[in-house]
């Protein structure tokens, strides 16, 4: 199965990680209901102050629709004062059946 994999690493400002996590709840809940979404998780690093969204999408078009969604846009505006930066990787992937 081919899909789009997104690794979005979030660098919260000092003392803001819990706020970003709380603000992620609605984003995650709404995204999991989107057509074309396969998986959407938020992971907290054990080693540093980073958070990582791991996303799987059926297509690039589904990802683009997600990025245009109201809940994605709201998350961006709600968290902009709490985040230093984000690094986003978008990968076209094919599962290997080993």
PLM features per residue range, with description:
Residues 2-4, 21, 59-64, 96:
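N-proximal accessory regions
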Residues 2-4, 42-47, 77-98:
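Glycine-rich beta-strand-turn "strand-cap" elements at beta-sheet edges
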Residues 5-10:
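Active-site-flanking beta-strand signature of metal-NTP-handling nucleotidyl enzymes
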Residues 11-17:
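Short, surface-exposed ligand-recognition loops at beta-strand->loop->(often short) alpha-helix junctions
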Residues 29-52:
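Short, glycine- and small/hydrophobic-rich beta-strand elements in well-ordered beta-sheets
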Residues 31-38, 56-90:
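An amphipathic, aromatic/His-enriched active-site/gating alpha helix that lines ligand/cofactor pockets
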């Amino acid at each position: 199965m081919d899909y789009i994999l997104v690794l979005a690493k979030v660098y919260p400002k000092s003392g803001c990680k819990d706020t970003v996590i709380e603000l992620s709840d609605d984003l995650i809940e709404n995204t999991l209901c989107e057509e074309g979404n396969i998986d959407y998780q938020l992971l907290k690093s054990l080693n540093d102050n980073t958070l990582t969204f791991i996303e799987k999408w059926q297509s690039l078009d589904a990802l683009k629709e997600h990025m245009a969604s109201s809940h994605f846009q709201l998350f961006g505006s709600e968290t902009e004062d709490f985040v230093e930066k984000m690094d986003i990787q978008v990968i076209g992937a094919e599962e290997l059946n080993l």
